[in-house]
Every structure is written in structure tokens, then in C-alpha cells.
């Protein structure tokens, strides 16, 4: 089986585990983009500890779930967004103001839309969570 989008696969694994009421989920295969996205989710309190386990086959992340995710998913296609356009995308993907985050890949790293607005930079939309 060929996995074309590892980030999308990881987010769907988290969504399914949350729906089943699991306390943790193992995500594999992994890459740096998944790690940085998980760190953003961790900083905003959507997931707990993220642990990397090297199993000799590329490794995997074990993510502690806190039960705070109502919906999570990738944004496809990955739209480029300017600093001033972030509010429009917020309205499109998030249920209300101040609820949830958009994950954005910028030239200064992967961050939430809140951090991107504070730094006044744009990037590419990766995912949403609330």
C-alpha cells in the first residue's frame, strides 16, 4: 500500500483514536512535518506528550490524547495564504472565533495561525483542529 500524504494519514489516525476514546495513538510512518505539526498541537493543549520510538523501520510517534479534539483534518490542497488572508481561512475552516487553530507552514517553521498573525507572516495551510 502506498501512502501519498503522511500528514493526512497521521491526522486521520488521531481523529479515529479520539472518536474511539483511546488514550494514546501510535503514528507511523513519520516525517519531520508530522513532528512539527504535533508540537503545535501540543503547545495549544490538544494533545499531550509526543514520544518518538525508533523501531528500526523508520520509527513511530506515540501521542497521548487528552480528549480535547472535536475535529481535526488536513487542508487539501495546501493553499498558500498571505498574512491578511488568514482571517478568511479562519472563517472557512474553524467553527467560531477563538475556537480551534489552523496549522501553517511558514518560512520560520510550522506554527498556528495565531502565531503567524502575531509575527505578520503568511505560509501554506496544512491542517485545522478544534
Curated annotation (Swiss-Prot):
Top-level division of the source organism's lineage: Archaea
UniProt entry keywords in alphabetical sequence: Ribonucleoprotein, Ribosomal protein, RNA-binding, rRNA-binding
GO molecular function, one term: rRNA binding
InterPro entries, A to Z: Ribosomal_uS8, Ribosomal_uS8_CS, Ribosomal_uS8_sf
SUPFAM superfamilies xrefs: Ribosomal protein S8
Family named by the database record: Belongs to the universal ribosomal protein uS8 family.
Quaternary structure and partners: Part of the 30S ribosomal subunit.
PANTHER family (UniProt xref): 40S RIBOSOMAL PROTEIN S15A
Protein function: One of the primary rRNA binding proteins, it binds directly to 16S rRNA central domain where it helps coordinate assembly of the platform of the 30S subunit.
HAMAP family: Ribosomal_uS8_A
Name this protein carries in UniProt: Small ribosomal subunit protein uS8
Provenance organism: Pyrobaculum neutrophilum (strain DSM 2338 / JCM 9278 / NBRC 100436 / V24Sta)
Lineage: Archaea, Thermoproteota, Thermoprotei, Thermoproteales, Thermoproteaceae
Name of the gene this protein is made from: rps8
Amino acid at each position: 500500500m502506498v501512502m501519498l500524504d503522511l500528514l493526512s494519514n497521521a491526522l486521520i489516525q488521531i481523529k479515529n483514536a479520539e472518536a474511539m476514546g483511546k488514550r494514546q495513538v501510535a503514528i507511523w510512518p513519520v516525517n519531520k512535518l508530522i513532528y512539527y505539526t504535533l508540537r503545535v498541537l501540543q503547545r495549544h493543549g490538544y494533545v499531550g506528550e509526543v514520544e518518538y520510538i525508533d523501531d528500526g523501520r523508520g520509527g513511530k510517534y506515540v501521542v497521548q490524547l487528552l480528549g480535547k479534539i472535536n475535529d481535526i483534518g488536513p487542508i487539501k490542497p495546501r493553499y498558500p495564504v498571505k498574512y491578511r488572508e488568514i482571517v478568511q481561512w479562519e472563517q472557512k475552516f474553524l467553527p467560531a472565533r477563538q475556537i480551534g487553530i489552523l496549522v501553517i507552514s511558514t518560512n520560520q517553521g510550522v506554527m498556528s495561525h495565531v502565531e503567524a498573525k502575531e509575527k505578520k507572516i503568511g505560509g501554506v495551510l496544512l491542517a485545522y483542529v478544534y
